[in-house]
Amino acid sequence: GKHVAIEVPAAMNLDECWQLINTSEKTRKHCMILENCCYDWFEMNTLNMAQQGVFGEVIRAQGAYIHNLSPFWNHYWKNGEGDKLGWRLDYNMKHRGDVYATHGLGPVAQALDIHRGDRMQTLVAMDTKSVVGKALVEARTDSACNGFRNGDHTTTLIRTANGKVIEIQHNVMTPQPYNRLYQLTGSKGFANKYPVEGYALDADQLTASGVQPKVDDLNSHGFLPEAEMEALVAKYQHPILKKYGEMAKEVGGHGGMDFIMDSRLVYCLQNGLPLDMDVYDLAEWCCLAELGELSMDNNCAPVAFPDFTRGEWNVVKGYKHAYAAPEEEAAAMEKAKAFTAKLKEQGAKEWAQAEKK
Protein backbone atom coordinates (compact mmCIF):
# COMPACT_ATOMS: atom_id res chain seq x y z
CA GLY A 1 0.00 0.00 0.00
CA LYS A 2 0.86 3.68 -0.23
CA HIS A 3 0.57 6.61 2.11
CA VAL A 4 -2.38 8.79 1.10
CA ALA A 5 -3.22 12.49 1.24
CA ILE A 6 -6.84 13.42 0.51
CA GLU A 7 -8.30 16.77 -0.50
CA VAL A 8 -10.89 18.28 1.84
CA PRO A 9 -13.41 17.40 3.02
CA ALA A 10 -12.14 13.80 2.47
CA ALA A 11 -15.18 12.03 3.97
CA MET A 12 -18.85 12.99 3.88
CA ASN A 13 -20.38 10.55 6.38
CA LEU A 14 -19.49 8.30 9.30
CA ASP A 15 -19.20 5.20 7.15
CA GLU A 16 -16.54 6.84 4.98
CA CYS A 17 -14.72 8.07 8.10
CA TRP A 18 -14.56 4.57 9.55
CA GLN A 19 -13.52 3.05 6.22
CA LEU A 20 -10.52 5.36 6.07
CA ILE A 21 -9.58 4.74 9.71
CA ASN A 22 -9.90 0.96 9.41
CA THR A 23 -7.87 0.88 6.19
CA SER A 24 -5.15 3.12 7.63
CA GLU A 25 -4.88 1.02 10.78
CA LYS A 26 -4.96 -2.29 8.90
CA THR A 27 -2.31 -1.29 6.35
CA ARG A 28 -0.26 0.85 8.78
CA LYS A 29 -0.25 3.63 6.19
CA HIS A 30 -0.74 7.34 6.75
CA CYS A 31 -3.97 8.97 5.62
CA MET A 32 -3.68 12.76 5.82
CA ILE A 33 -6.38 15.32 5.15
CA LEU A 34 -5.05 18.20 3.03
CA GLU A 35 -6.38 20.98 5.24
CA ASN A 36 -4.34 23.92 4.03
CA CYS A 37 -5.94 26.47 6.37
CA CYS A 38 -3.95 24.97 9.24
CA TYR A 39 -0.88 26.48 7.56
CA ASP A 40 -1.96 30.08 7.11
CA TRP A 41 0.25 32.65 8.82
CA PHE A 42 -2.16 33.94 11.46
CA GLU A 43 -3.31 30.44 12.41
CA MET A 44 0.22 29.08 12.76
CA ASN A 45 1.55 31.99 14.80
CA THR A 46 -1.54 31.98 16.99
CA LEU A 47 -1.23 28.23 17.53
CA ASN A 48 2.33 28.76 18.71
CA MET A 49 1.15 31.49 21.09
CA ALA A 50 -1.56 29.20 22.46
CA GLN A 51 0.95 26.39 22.96
CA GLN A 52 3.28 28.79 24.79
CA GLY A 53 0.45 29.85 27.14
CA VAL A 54 0.05 33.40 25.83
CA PHE A 55 -3.75 33.23 26.07
CA GLY A 56 -3.84 31.24 29.29
CA GLU A 57 -6.16 28.26 28.96
CA VAL A 58 -8.10 28.39 25.70
CA ILE A 59 -11.72 27.68 26.63
CA ARG A 60 -13.65 28.61 23.50
CA ALA A 61 -12.94 28.68 19.78
CA GLN A 62 -14.73 29.66 16.61
CA GLY A 63 -14.18 28.69 13.00
CA ALA A 64 -16.16 28.96 9.80
CA TYR A 65 -16.40 28.55 6.09
CA ILE A 66 -18.33 31.60 4.94
CA HIS A 67 -17.76 32.04 1.22
CA ASN A 68 -20.37 33.31 -1.22
CA LEU A 69 -20.12 30.84 -4.12
CA SER A 70 -22.42 32.71 -6.50
CA PRO A 71 -19.59 33.33 -9.02
CA PHE A 72 -18.66 29.64 -9.01
CA TRP A 73 -21.85 27.55 -9.13
CA ASN A 74 -21.76 27.27 -12.93
CA HIS A 75 -18.15 26.08 -12.92
CA TYR A 76 -18.61 22.89 -10.90
CA TRP A 77 -18.59 19.58 -12.73
CA LYS A 78 -21.88 18.64 -14.38
CA ASN A 79 -22.99 15.11 -15.25
CA GLY A 80 -23.90 15.73 -18.87
CA GLU A 81 -25.98 18.40 -20.59
CA GLY A 82 -29.07 17.51 -18.58
CA ASP A 83 -27.39 18.42 -15.29
CA LYS A 84 -28.48 21.99 -14.57
CA LEU A 85 -27.09 22.22 -11.04
CA GLY A 86 -23.57 20.80 -10.99
CA TRP A 87 -22.36 18.43 -8.32
CA ARG A 88 -21.89 20.93 -5.48
CA LEU A 89 -25.26 22.65 -5.65
CA ASP A 90 -26.92 19.26 -6.08
CA TYR A 91 -25.10 17.92 -3.00
CA ASN A 92 -26.16 20.90 -0.90
CA MET A 93 -29.73 20.46 -2.08
CA LYS A 94 -29.78 16.83 -0.90
CA HIS A 95 -27.78 17.06 2.34
CA ARG A 96 -28.28 19.01 5.53
CA GLY A 97 -25.51 19.92 7.94
CA ASP A 98 -22.06 21.48 7.71
CA VAL A 99 -20.81 19.75 4.57
CA TYR A 100 -17.54 21.73 4.43
CA ALA A 101 -16.41 22.08 8.03
CA THR A 102 -12.69 21.40 7.89
CA HIS A 103 -11.41 24.89 6.94
CA GLY A 104 -12.94 26.30 10.11
CA LEU A 105 -12.63 23.32 12.44
CA GLY A 106 -9.13 22.09 11.62
CA PRO A 107 -7.06 25.01 12.95
CA VAL A 108 -9.08 25.43 16.16
CA ALA A 109 -9.06 21.67 16.83
CA GLN A 110 -5.27 21.80 16.84
CA ALA A 111 -5.29 24.72 19.27
CA LEU A 112 -7.58 22.72 21.59
CA ASP A 113 -5.49 19.52 21.46
CA ILE A 114 -8.33 17.41 20.09
CA HIS A 115 -7.55 13.69 20.55
CA ARG A 116 -4.32 14.75 22.17
CA GLY A 117 -5.69 15.27 25.66
CA ASP A 118 -9.25 16.30 24.83
CA ARG A 119 -12.00 15.11 22.53
CA MET A 120 -15.15 16.49 20.96
CA GLN A 121 -17.97 14.90 22.92
CA THR A 122 -21.35 16.39 21.96
CA LEU A 123 -22.74 18.69 19.29
CA VAL A 124 -25.93 20.60 18.65
CA ALA A 125 -26.57 22.01 15.17
CA MET A 126 -29.06 24.56 13.88
CA ASP A 127 -29.63 26.03 10.44
CA THR A 128 -31.71 28.72 8.82
CA LYS A 129 -34.21 27.83 6.17
CA SER A 130 -33.00 27.76 2.59
CA VAL A 131 -33.80 30.95 0.70
CA VAL A 132 -30.85 31.50 -1.61
CA GLY A 133 -30.21 27.81 -2.25
CA LYS A 134 -33.81 27.17 -3.14
CA ALA A 135 -33.86 30.17 -5.50
CA LEU A 136 -30.69 28.96 -7.23
CA VAL A 137 -32.27 25.61 -8.02
CA GLU A 138 -35.50 27.17 -9.24
CA ALA A 139 -33.63 29.58 -11.51
CA ARG A 140 -31.60 26.77 -13.05
CA THR A 141 -34.38 24.21 -13.43
CA ASP A 142 -37.27 26.58 -14.15
CA SER A 143 -39.39 24.60 -11.69
CA ALA A 144 -40.38 24.78 -8.03
CA CYS A 145 -37.88 23.53 -5.45
CA ASN A 146 -39.69 22.12 -2.44
CA GLY A 147 -36.83 20.33 -0.73
CA PHE A 148 -33.50 22.14 -0.48
CA ARG A 149 -31.98 20.43 2.55
CA ASN A 150 -28.99 22.62 3.34
CA GLY A 151 -29.87 25.82 5.17
CA ASP A 152 -28.34 29.05 3.94
CA HIS A 153 -26.45 29.34 7.24
CA THR A 154 -25.59 26.43 9.54
CA THR A 155 -24.18 26.76 13.06
CA THR A 156 -22.73 23.84 15.03
CA LEU A 157 -21.91 24.04 18.74
CA ILE A 158 -19.53 21.43 20.14
CA ARG A 159 -18.62 20.69 23.76
CA THR A 160 -15.44 18.80 24.55
CA ALA A 161 -14.68 16.31 27.31
CA ASN A 162 -12.63 18.98 29.11
CA GLY A 163 -15.42 21.55 29.04
CA LYS A 164 -14.31 23.63 26.05
CA VAL A 165 -16.79 24.93 23.45
CA ILE A 166 -16.29 25.16 19.69
CA GLU A 167 -18.60 27.04 17.33
CA ILE A 168 -18.40 26.26 13.61
CA GLN A 169 -20.38 28.06 10.89
CA HIS A 170 -21.09 27.24 7.24
CA ASN A 171 -22.54 29.63 4.66
CA VAL A 172 -21.88 29.49 0.92
CA MET A 173 -25.10 31.23 -0.10
CA THR A 174 -25.48 34.79 1.15
CA PRO A 175 -23.51 37.85 -0.05
CA GLN A 176 -20.92 38.62 2.60
CA PRO A 177 -17.12 38.84 2.81
CA TYR A 178 -15.05 35.67 2.89
CA ASN A 179 -14.65 34.61 6.51
CA ARG A 180 -13.14 31.66 8.37
CA LEU A 181 -13.56 33.42 11.75
CA TYR A 182 -10.68 31.68 13.58
CA GLN A 183 -11.16 33.02 17.06
CA LEU A 184 -9.63 31.77 20.30
CA THR A 185 -10.89 32.89 23.72
CA GLY A 186 -8.53 32.18 26.58
CA SER A 187 -8.49 32.85 30.30
CA LYS A 188 -5.78 35.49 29.79
CA GLY A 189 -6.09 36.55 26.17
CA PHE A 190 -7.94 36.55 22.89
CA ALA A 191 -7.11 36.11 19.19
CA ASN A 192 -9.27 36.93 16.17
CA LYS A 193 -8.53 36.64 12.45
CA TYR A 194 -11.68 37.61 10.54
CA PRO A 195 -12.86 40.22 9.76
CA VAL A 196 -10.05 42.04 11.61
CA GLU A 197 -6.82 40.42 12.74
CA GLY A 198 -5.93 41.19 16.31
CA TYR A 199 -4.85 40.05 19.75
CA ALA A 200 -5.98 41.19 23.18
CA LEU A 201 -4.17 40.26 26.40
CA ASP A 202 -4.71 41.17 30.03
CA ALA A 203 -2.09 43.48 31.51
CA ASP A 204 -0.15 40.81 33.40
CA GLN A 205 -0.04 38.50 30.41
CA LEU A 206 1.10 41.32 28.16
CA THR A 207 4.12 41.87 30.38
CA ALA A 208 4.74 38.13 30.75
CA SER A 209 4.75 37.79 26.97
CA GLY A 210 7.51 40.37 26.71
CA VAL A 211 5.48 42.98 24.86
CA GLN A 212 5.95 46.29 26.63
CA PRO A 213 3.12 48.81 26.17
CA LYS A 214 4.03 52.07 24.45
CA VAL A 215 0.76 53.77 25.35
CA ASP A 216 -0.72 54.38 28.78
CA ASP A 217 -4.19 52.97 28.23
CA LEU A 218 -3.25 49.65 26.62
CA ASN A 219 -5.66 46.99 27.92
CA SER A 220 -7.75 44.03 26.84
CA HIS A 221 -10.77 46.22 26.01
CA GLY A 222 -9.33 46.61 22.52
CA PHE A 223 -6.87 44.93 20.19
CA LEU A 224 -3.18 45.56 20.65
CA PRO A 225 -1.90 48.51 18.62
CA GLU A 226 -0.05 47.59 15.44
CA ALA A 227 3.45 47.94 16.87
CA GLU A 228 2.69 45.73 19.88
CA MET A 229 0.94 43.17 17.68
CA GLU A 230 3.94 43.01 15.34
CA ALA A 231 6.25 42.53 18.32
CA LEU A 232 4.08 39.70 19.64
CA VAL A 233 3.99 37.97 16.25
CA ALA A 234 7.75 38.39 15.82
CA LYS A 235 8.40 36.79 19.19
CA TYR A 236 6.08 33.85 18.58
CA GLN A 237 6.60 33.30 14.86
CA HIS A 238 6.03 29.61 14.24
CA PRO A 239 9.21 27.61 13.46
CA ILE A 240 7.58 26.18 10.33
CA LEU A 241 6.97 29.70 9.01
CA LYS A 242 10.57 30.61 9.74
CA LYS A 243 11.66 27.71 7.56
CA TYR A 244 9.16 27.85 4.70
CA GLY A 245 7.42 31.22 4.93
CA GLU A 246 9.42 33.35 2.50
CA MET A 247 9.70 30.58 -0.07
CA ALA A 248 5.96 29.93 0.25
CA LYS A 249 5.17 33.57 -0.53
CA GLU A 250 7.20 33.30 -3.73
CA VAL A 251 5.66 30.02 -4.85
CA GLY A 252 2.10 30.92 -3.85
CA GLY A 253 -0.89 28.61 -3.68
CA HIS A 254 -3.64 30.16 -1.55
CA GLY A 255 -1.11 32.73 -0.41
CA GLY A 256 1.55 30.11 0.22
CA MET A 257 -0.22 27.88 2.71
CA ASP A 258 -0.56 25.10 0.10
CA PHE A 259 3.21 25.10 -0.34
CA ILE A 260 3.81 24.93 3.41
CA MET A 261 1.33 22.07 3.76
CA ASP A 262 2.93 20.10 0.93
CA SER A 263 6.41 20.81 2.29
CA ARG A 264 5.47 19.51 5.73
CA LEU A 265 3.89 16.39 4.24
CA VAL A 266 7.06 15.61 2.28
CA TYR A 267 9.31 16.50 5.24
CA CYS A 268 7.50 14.19 7.65
CA LEU A 269 7.44 11.30 5.19
CA GLN A 270 11.13 11.73 4.33
CA ASN A 271 12.10 11.79 7.99
CA GLY A 272 9.78 9.03 9.19
CA LEU A 273 7.82 11.37 11.45
CA PRO A 274 4.14 11.51 12.45
CA LEU A 275 2.20 13.69 10.01
CA ASP A 276 0.79 17.04 11.12
CA MET A 277 -2.75 15.74 10.54
CA ASP A 278 -3.66 12.08 10.90
CA VAL A 279 -6.62 9.94 9.92
CA TYR A 280 -8.32 10.63 13.26
CA ASP A 281 -8.17 14.38 12.60
CA LEU A 282 -9.73 13.65 9.22
CA ALA A 283 -12.63 11.75 10.75
CA GLU A 284 -13.24 14.22 13.58
CA TRP A 285 -13.29 17.24 11.29
CA CYS A 286 -15.41 15.62 8.58
CA CYS A 287 -18.04 13.93 10.75
CA LEU A 288 -19.83 17.23 11.44
CA ALA A 289 -21.73 16.74 8.19
CA GLU A 290 -23.67 13.64 9.25
CA LEU A 291 -23.76 14.39 12.98
CA GLY A 292 -25.14 17.87 12.35
CA GLU A 293 -27.75 16.44 10.02
CA LEU A 294 -28.79 13.97 12.74
CA SER A 295 -29.09 16.81 15.24
CA MET A 296 -31.19 19.08 13.04
CA ASP A 297 -33.43 16.30 11.76
CA ASN A 298 -34.25 15.53 15.41
CA ASN A 299 -35.28 19.00 16.56
CA CYS A 300 -31.67 20.11 17.09
CA ALA A 301 -31.02 17.39 19.64
CA PRO A 302 -27.58 16.80 21.17
CA VAL A 303 -25.61 14.14 19.29
CA ALA A 304 -22.61 12.26 20.67
CA PHE A 305 -19.34 12.06 18.74
CA PRO A 306 -17.89 8.62 18.08
CA ASP A 307 -14.46 8.11 19.61
CA PHE A 308 -12.55 7.46 16.42
CA THR A 309 -9.37 6.76 18.44
CA ARG A 310 -11.06 3.80 20.19
CA GLY A 311 -10.23 5.14 23.64
CA GLU A 312 -6.74 6.51 22.88
CA TRP A 313 -7.68 10.20 22.72
CA ASN A 314 -5.95 11.03 26.02
CA VAL A 315 -2.67 9.16 25.47
CA VAL A 316 -0.79 11.91 23.62
CA LYS A 317 -0.67 15.13 25.65
CA GLY A 318 -0.93 18.24 23.52
CA TYR A 319 -0.84 18.82 19.77
CA LYS A 320 2.71 19.13 18.44
CA HIS A 321 4.47 19.28 15.08
CA ALA A 322 7.19 16.68 14.71
CA TYR A 323 10.77 17.63 13.82
CA ALA A 324 13.83 15.56 13.00
CA ALA A 325 17.21 16.17 14.60
CA PRO A 326 19.38 18.46 12.42
CA GLU A 327 21.77 15.68 11.41
CA GLU A 328 18.89 13.33 10.57
CA GLU A 329 17.16 16.06 8.59
CA ALA A 330 20.33 16.76 6.60
CA ALA A 331 20.82 13.06 5.83
CA ALA A 332 17.22 12.69 4.67
CA MET A 333 17.58 15.76 2.47
CA GLU A 334 20.72 14.40 0.78
CA LYS A 335 19.04 11.06 0.23
CA ALA A 336 16.02 12.78 -1.33
CA LYS A 337 18.24 14.91 -3.59
CA ALA A 338 20.10 11.82 -4.81
CA PHE A 339 16.84 10.00 -5.49
CA THR A 340 15.44 12.99 -7.38
CA ALA A 341 18.61 13.30 -9.47
CA LYS A 342 18.38 9.61 -10.35
CA LEU A 343 14.76 10.02 -11.42
CA LYS A 344 15.63 13.03 -13.58
CA GLU A 345 18.48 11.14 -15.21
CA GLN A 346 16.27 8.15 -15.96
CA GLY A 347 13.51 10.43 -17.24
CA ALA A 348 15.90 12.22 -19.58
CA LYS A 349 17.05 8.89 -21.04
CA GLU A 350 13.50 7.69 -21.61
CA TRP A 351 12.52 11.02 -23.15
CA ALA A 352 15.50 10.89 -25.52
CA GLN A 353 14.59 7.36 -26.57
CA ALA A 354 11.00 8.40 -27.18
CA GLU A 355 12.10 11.28 -29.42
CA LYS A 356 14.16 8.90 -31.57
CA LYS A 357 11.10 6.78 -32.37
Predicted regions, residues:
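Predominantly a Rossmann-like dinucleotide-binding segment in NAD(P)-dependent oxidoreductases
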Residues: 26-32, 37-148
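Ligand-binding pocket scaffold of soluble enzyme catalytic domains
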Residues: 21, 27-28, 65, 257, ...
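Beta-strand-loop-alpha-helix segment that lines the small-molecule cofactor/substrate pocket
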Residues: 1-39, 53
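A short catalytic or substrate-binding loop motif that flags glycine-/basic-rich loops and adjacent residues
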Residues: 102-103, 147-152, 160-161, 175-176
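Aromatic/hydrophobic pocket-lining residues that form π-stacking "cages" and hydrophobic walls in ligand
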Residues: 20, 46, 291
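C-terminal helical cap and adjacent loop that interface with cofactors, partners, or active-site loops
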Residues: 109, 177-185, 192-195, 201-357
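Short glycine/serine/proline-enriched coil/turn segments at secondary-structure junctions
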Residues: 69-71, 174-177
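Active-site beta-strand termini and strand-to-loop segments that position acidic
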Residues: 156-162, 186
